Amino acid sequence: MTRQPVQALLTDAVARGVAPGLSAAVVRPDGQIHTFAVGARGASDPAPMDPETVFWVASCTKAITTAAALELVARGRLDLDEPVGRRLPGLAEPSVLEGFDADGAPIERPARRPVTLRNLLTHTSGLAYDFNSAETLRFLEHRGQNLGSAGGLGLPLLFEPGERWCYGVGIDVAGLLIEAATGRSLGEALSEIVFGPLGMNDTTFDPTPEYNARRAGLHARLPDGQLAPIDAIPPLPADLRGGGGLCSTPTDYAKFLRAVVHGGGGVLSAATLAGLSTSQTDEVGVGEIQSVMPHLSSDYRPMPGVRKGFTFGFLQNHDALPGGRAAGSLSWAGLPNCYYWADPAGGVAGALFAQSLPFADPRVLEVFDAFERAVYAS
């Protein structure tokens, strides 16, 4: 792989104000990882971005939590089709939100089906987030809560489990299921199952002061296109860690992606790899993310015109992308404009991390698309 094209496009992006700094990593077909870092850690932090700069990766957490859950399934400690409520009493009797009465109070009914781990890992449980569901947001506001205080177990379903696809807190709840199955915190369980074996020493739910000293600053995109520093998101509560709580580096995250595209890296079992790479939603389809909190996220319509499905943990493109990933590749993203793909057919993967809101910033998405094409061209 020739480094210069990727380095040049990242340098140009920073010069154009896409981000104060960008960091990226590429997994090559031979398994080597190439790293890139350009610019500064933040608009108010002149320290240079480098491969050791750490990022809040938000929903990039989901694939790792999913892989750990599938490993526990392979070891007989979890069951994809067991009702989650047997281990998590908060979902023992799930309810479906049918609307709101004249006074604005939620109208709920008992769900006819139980929520399963299969539902949680494929976003077919009926659970949403507040930022992409006006109904969930209204429910929380009526209760005087936010997602952080309610957690994944404090939400109603929007539909019967398995009925359709909706991006939500399912994998956050799966993190609680991992804790129930192992008797350990999610961080301890992931360290044992994933981080330790893969040498991911820069990935954590609980950053220390020394770790935070290497952290990239978080920013908000202003109406004039400029970026303004904002406060870092504090560590998420346990209910929401499995879907969005990790901090990491592109290099560390690439170690996980390398295991996904290179046969498990001696860590992920064949059964886990099969689950991560097989679409589970072809009957119900995969929807778009329509934001109701524009300060957090724009609408997200990945790969328009491309046939897609959702595996356990990943979005999967059923068609090849021109100049980029092969059919059957896997991808997702994190709220502060962190993006990645993993191409098992080519043994290639890439991660590009920024730290800005709202999510799905078209400027960063344009760079990510160019980054992917540059990787395959070189």
Question: What does each model-found stretch correspond to?
Answer:
Residues S356-S378:
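Generic C-terminus detector
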Residues T2, V6, V57, T61, ...:
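Hydrophobic (often cysteine-bearing) scaffold residues that line and stabilize catalytic clefts
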Residues R301, T311-G313, G334-A342:
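Short glycine-rich, acidic/polar surface loops and turns
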Residues F36, Y339-W341, G347-S356:
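Short, well-ordered beta-strand elements
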Residues V6-L10, A24, D30, W56-V84, ...:
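Active-site SXXK
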Residues T35, R86-G324:
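Short, surface-exposed loop or secondary-structure junction motifs
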Residues R325-S329:
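A conserved acidic, glycine/proline-rich C-terminal tail/linker
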Residues T2-V57, V96-A102:
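Short, conserved catalytic-motif segment at the N-terminal edge
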